[in-house]
Amino acid sequence: MEKILKPISGFLALLVSLVLIAFSGFLFAAGKNEPLIIACGFVLFFAALFIIKGLMIINPNHSRVLNFFGKYVGTVKNNGLFFVNPLYSTLKVSLRAQNLQGQSLKVNDKMGNPIEIGAVIVWKVGDTYKAVYEVDDYKDYVGKQSEAAVRHLAVSFAYDNLEDEGAEITLRDGGEKV
């Protein structure tokens, strides 16, 4: 089940990390012969790098799925600069509408006549949790499922009602209803 997260703004974390980097540079310059001050500078510098690792940019119509050592934490769907736990791993998932140009399939219709059928399918990810965790490759999954649906559609209806006079909906005349 998808869980939407609202992370904090990344601008404050970016400001804090820049201040830490500047202060660590000051400590490096000020503590030329003082190993304790130089060590503090290193600690501040690596703390700033750790904070920067938690920054993420999400573009419009994209999302990030967050994991914490293999456990699903949530999904961020808002766009902008955000700060999350630096130990989270993230997976990008596009929420944009995508086109799938199905290849032309040779199948038999309901009456047993050979026909050639194809489809152009527009789809987009609705649930990022299912897209990432319930299938291996969701783009390949959509392609295979759409081909199976087109095959099922072709064998469920007659192409034309010349042989089946009782057919109300055909693939040729009832395209909108099919």
Show where each model-derived region lies.
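Membrane-bilayer interface helices and TM-boundary transition segments
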Residues: N61-R64, G74, L100, L105
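Hydrophobic alpha-helical transmembrane segments
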Residues: F26-F45
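Aromatic-capped interface at the extracytoplasmic side
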Residues: F50-S63
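Amphipathic, interface-forming alpha-helical segments with heptad-repeat character
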Residues: Y88, L95-V178
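Hydrophobic core of alpha-helical transmembrane segments in multi-pass integral membrane proteins
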Residues: L14-F26, F45
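N-terminal membrane-targeting/pre-transmembrane regions
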Residues: M1-L18
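Membrane-cytosol interface motif
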Residues: S63-Y88
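Short Pro/Gly-enriched beta-strand edge/turn motifs at strand-loop
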Residues: L44-A48, N99-G102
